[in-house]
Structure formats: structure tokens, C-alpha cells
């Protein structure tokens, strides 16, 4: 199972918000932002804070990618 956060980065662009703005607004640690950039697993409570900050749902910020798929 792979997760990617491409939808998060696109949503930030749509909202004219930088990753640093999100980090401050959602109280996200720098190492968690690195995990997001690397498409690594992030704890659900953190994803919940991101969703609440952006007024989004989990599916708006991340997607499950099948192994071997490109994307």
C-alpha cells in the first residue's frame, strides 16, 4: 500500500497557501511536513488537523495508490 499527498499540494495551490502556512496553521512539526513530502505514512490525528485547517476531507488531501501503479 502506498499513500500519496499530491491532492494536498494541489489544494494548497488552489487556496493560495504555502506549505509553511499550513504547518503554522495546523501546528504540524517540520519532520511531519517532510513525511508528507516523501509520501510517507502520517498519523491520523495530524491528517485530521490538516483537514480541519483546510476545510477538507481525507480524500481531498491524499489517495491510496496500488503497488506498481504510477501516480
Identify the residue ranges that each predicted region occupies:
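Short, charged recognition helix plus adjacent turn
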Residues: 2, 11, 62-71
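Residue-level detection of the helix-turn-helix DNA-binding "recognition helix"
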Residues: 13, 27, 38, 66
